[in-house]
């Protein structure tokens, strides 16, 4: 009695219905509100939940519409990494996710960028950014 408990918010990544593009949008929102979650948990199917039904069936039980559910460990890792994009360990996964979603605009030194390429940290970075943007523009 009388103990004070600290609430620790956490996020669940790879929730059924969440695509990689959705995860990028969430990362932008987290950046905009200045929040970097310390704890992120991958979605784990649990018996009796609508989310689990969506995960296994690929269908939203409320709407009957198809939903995406990340099942591949690498896809799940990219969604998780995006929520903690400032963590240096997630750098490669964040870069890959941004490339897959054609969001090269979030790689660079602008304040809105999720993945910084500051030339002071990496002398090859500026060339890499130019090459990446050129590659993305050719795809469009």
Model segments located where?
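Ordered, helix-dominated protein-protein interaction surfaces in large eukaryotic regulatory proteins
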Residues: 28, 32, 42, 99-100, ...
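Catalytic cores of alpha/beta
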Residues: 16-31
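Short, small-residue-biased leader/transition segments that mark boundaries at the very start
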Residues: 1-5
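Conserved strand-turn element in the central/C-terminal portion of the radical SAM core barrel
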Residues: 6-20, 41-46
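Radical SAM enzyme core and accessory elements
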Residues: 47-140
């Amino acid at each position: 009695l009388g103990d004070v408990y600290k609430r620790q918010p956490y996020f669940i990544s790879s929730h059924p219905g969440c695509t990689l593009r959705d995860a990028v949008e969430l990362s932008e929102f987290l950046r905009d509100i200045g929040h970097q979650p310390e704890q992120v948990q991958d979605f784990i199917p649990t018996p009796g939940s609508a989310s689990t039904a969506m995960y296994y069936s690929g269908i939203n039980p409320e709407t009957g519409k198809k939903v995406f559910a990340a099942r591949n460990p690498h896809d799940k890792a990219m969604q998780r990494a995006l929520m903690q994009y400032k963590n240096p360990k997630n750098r490669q996964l964040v870069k890959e996710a941004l490339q897959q979603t054609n969001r090269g605009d979030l790689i660079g030194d602008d304040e809105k960028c999720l993945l910084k390429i500051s030339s002071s940290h990496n002398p090859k970075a500026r060339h890499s950014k130019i090459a990446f943007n050129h590659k993305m523009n050719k795809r469009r």
